[in-house]
């Protein structure tokens, strides 16, 4: 069927048609022109190679593929070739099954598992043989066992049978019973013997052995059967089942003495039941299972499993075995914490990029330079502010010795809260610079925490505090809100400066029930007017001086509190009251801190 306008019909590929069928049908649409014969041969060779590679990926060998292609032809479609390969592979598998492989293949080993081991052609040993090979040989003193079962009056052969059966039930295969040969004679009233046929049955099974005995001049000559018993048990590294201690044999040879002490298994008969002790060598010796084994069982297999299982609440103090817990020794939490504390290395001082530790003088000078730079920024900002400017209720405050603060999200300098608290600062927690650098909001929260530590609960009136005195060009237009709350809201935008020195509180303030209640605002003053500088402590410095020296000490104290904890600054400035150089004081503070690490 030809297409419209004389075009050749285009063969559509069905979804089930393979790639090779589509290429074969496409190549059969027309004979190639003479100029394309070479290209067609190369294409057919490439197509054949692709077919071979495809079938080899499916697991068929090159020999099988070529034999099938010779049988069906090179132009055979993929499905036909694949069907023939399946039949050929099935026949090959039958041939392999009928003809045994002379060299068995090695087992596959997972990647990283090392070299594969040679196949073990020997059949695995049964579980009973493995169990019996781990058990010690048993040598039974037949005369002692029979007389014990007969209550020392009758030679009861049934007692020997009970003992032998007990060891057979436990998996022992090497059992030997020694009995004097004269016990095979007919019983007499003075020598009663019961169940004598058991001796012959055990002898047929090669379990019982008769020791030699004979009559000489009408008298019975009996060999010492105990020496047979101890000697065989010693040479076979087994155990001796008897209630006799063989004192005479212990004195003959020293190795026998030790062997009898360690390998003697005593027993009891309770109503035709053979019962050896569970602890043959005493309470602190091995158990009966380990006593009868060549290699003792591990502790996990010996211990009795805990009846509570996973619900056990005794922890590491439980004396029973928990298979779900790791076998390594466990320690308590306190012991682990102590071990970790001993293993953890001490913290070394931080180093700079060149690997050198910063000296105290360079560290203090750099920090003080940053503090002075922030103070200059605050002065510039305050000088640019005009008294008449008003930004929708927002107020900018200025003091000559203030420190510049950035809004939330910016970077600022640390701020010392010593001027707001007239009490001693030894009990205040140290506020890190990272916490105070996050902005005025975090400053308010830090100061709230500091005041909360001193004041206790909301219902407890704390000690009198020096209030924060705000300077506003608008006088009473500011609402009477909490000092820090109004301060935080008024400084929400732009850069502001917080004064470092404040005038003392008025002589009489009404007591506040809560620390957040505001103090009455002072009379309005000009923004550019510099307030009188007061030293900390309402006109009295902590070092007992007044005047210009106290003012200079207060300034140095304020700067150092922005770098070091206040209690360290007070301690060092108290020791060196005449020293006013910030760098030297910083070096002394670092030296004092190294000498008193606990403070």
UniProtKB/Swiss-Prot annotation:
GO molecular function annotations of the record: chromatin binding; DNA binding; miRNA binding; mRNA 3'-UTR AU-rich region binding; mRNA 3'-UTR binding; mRNA binding; ribosome binding; RNA binding
Region (Ubiquitin association domain), start-end ranges: 42-87
Protein's GO biological process: 3'-UTR-mediated mRNA destabilization; angiogenesis; apoptotic process; cell differentiation; cellular response to chemokine; cellular response to glucose starvation; cellular response to interleukin-1; cellular response to ionomycin
Subunit field text: Oligomer. Found in a deubiquitination complex with TANK, USP10 and ZC3H12A; this complex inhibits genotoxic stress- or interleukin-1-beta-mediated NF-kappaB activation by promoting IKBKG or TRAF6 deubiquitination. Interacts with IKBKG; this interaction increases in response to DNA damage. Interacts with TANK; this interaction increases in response to DNA damage and serves as a bridge to anchor both TANK and USP10 into a deubiquitinating complex. Interacts with TRAF6; this interaction increases in response to DNA damage and is stimulated by TANK.
Disease: Increased expression of ZC3H12A is associated with ischemic heart disease.
Domain remarks in the Swiss-Prot or TrEMBL record: The C3H1-type zinc finger domain and C-terminal region are necessary for pre-miRNA binding. The C-terminal region and proline-rich domain are necessary for oligomerization.
Function: Endoribonuclease involved in various biological functions such as cellular inflammatory response and immune homeostasis, glial differentiation of neuroprogenitor cells, cell death of cardiomyocytes, adipogenesis and angiogenesis. Functions as an endoribonuclease involved in mRNA decay. Modulates the inflammatory response by promoting the degradation of a set of translationally active cytokine-induced inflammation-related mRNAs, such as IL6 and IL12B, during the early phase of inflammation. (Microbial infection) Binds to Japanese encephalitis virus (JEV) and Dengue virus (DEN) RNAs.
Family listed: Belongs to the ZC3H12 family.
Name of the protein in question: Endoribonuclease ZC3H12A
Organism: Homo sapiens (Human)
Phylogenetic lineage: Eukaryota, Metazoa, Chordata, Craniata, Vertebrata
């Amino acid at each position: 069927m030809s297409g419209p306008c004389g075009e050749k019909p285009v063969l559509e590929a069905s979804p089930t048609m393979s790639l090779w069928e589509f290429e074969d049908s496409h190549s059969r649409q027309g004979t190639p022109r003479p100029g394309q014969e070479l290209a067609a041969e190369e294409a057919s060779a490439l197509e054949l190679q692709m077919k071979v590679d495809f079938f080899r990926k499916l697991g068929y060998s090159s020999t099988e593929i070529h034999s099938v292609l010779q049988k069906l032809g090179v132009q055979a479609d993929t499905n036909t070739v694949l069907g023939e390969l399946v039949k050929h592979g099935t026949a090959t598998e039958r041939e392999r099954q009928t003809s045994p492989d002379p060299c068995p293949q090695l087992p596959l080993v997972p990647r990283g598992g090392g070299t594969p081991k040679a196949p073990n052609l020997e059949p695995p040993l049964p579980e009973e043989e493995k169990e019996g090979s781990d058990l010690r040989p048993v040598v039974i003193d037949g005369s002692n066992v029979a007389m014990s079962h007969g209550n020392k009056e009758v030679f009861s052969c049934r007692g020997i049978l009970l003992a032998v059966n007990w060891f057979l039930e436990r998996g022992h295969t090497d059992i030997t019973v020694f009995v004097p040969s004269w016990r095979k004679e007919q019983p007499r009233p003075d020598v009663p013997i019961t169940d004598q046929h058991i001796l012959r049955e055990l002898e047929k099974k090669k379990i019982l052995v008769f020791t030699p005995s004979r009559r000489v001049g009408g008298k019975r000559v009996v060999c010492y059967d105990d020496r047979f018993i101890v000697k065989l048990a010693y040479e076979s590294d087994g155990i001796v089942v008897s209630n006799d201690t063989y004192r005479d044999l212990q004195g003959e040879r020293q190795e026998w003495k030790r062997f009898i002490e360690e390998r003697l298994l005593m027993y009891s008969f309770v109503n035709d039941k053979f019962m050896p002790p569970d602890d043959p060598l005493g309470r602190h010796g091995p158990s009966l299972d380990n006593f009868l084994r060549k290699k003792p069982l591990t502790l996990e297999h010996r211990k009795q499993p805990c009846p509570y299982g996973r619900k056990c609440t005794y922890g590491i103090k439980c004396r029973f075995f928990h298979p779900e817990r790791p076998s390594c020794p466990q320690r308590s939490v306190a012991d682990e914490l102590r071990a970790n504390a001993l293993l953890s290395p001490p913290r070394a001082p931080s180093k700079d990029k060149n690997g050198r530790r910063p000296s105290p003088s360079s560290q203090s000078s750099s920090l003080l330079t940053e503090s002075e730079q922030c103070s200059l920024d605050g002065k510039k900002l305050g000088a640019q502010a005009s008294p008449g400017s008003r930004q929708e209720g927002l107020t900018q405050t200025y003091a000559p010795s203030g420190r510049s603060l950035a809004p939330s999200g910016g970077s600022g300098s640390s701020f010392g809260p010593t001027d707001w608290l007239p009490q001693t600062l030894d009990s205040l927690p140290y506020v890190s610079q990272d916490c105070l650098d996050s902005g005025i909001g975090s400053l308010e929260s830090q100061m709230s925490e500091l005041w909360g530590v001193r004041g206790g609960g909301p219902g407890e009136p704390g000690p009198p505090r020096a209030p924060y005195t705000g300077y506003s060009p608008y006088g009473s237009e500011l609402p009477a809100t909490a000092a820090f709350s109004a301060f935080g809201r008024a400084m929400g935008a732009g850069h502001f400066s917080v004064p470092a020195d404040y005038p003392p509180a008025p002589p009489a303030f009404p007591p506040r029930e809560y620390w957040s209640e505001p103090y009455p605002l002072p009379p309005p003053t000009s923004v550019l007017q510099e307030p009188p500088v007061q030293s900390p402590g309402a006109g009295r410095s902590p070092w007992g001086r007044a005047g210009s020296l106290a003012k200079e000490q207060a300034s140095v104290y304020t700067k150092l509190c922005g770098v070091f904890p206040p209690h360290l600054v007070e301690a060092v400035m108290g020791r060196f009251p005449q020293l006013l150089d910030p760098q030297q004081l910083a070096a002394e503070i670092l030296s004092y801190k190294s000498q008193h690490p606990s403070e």
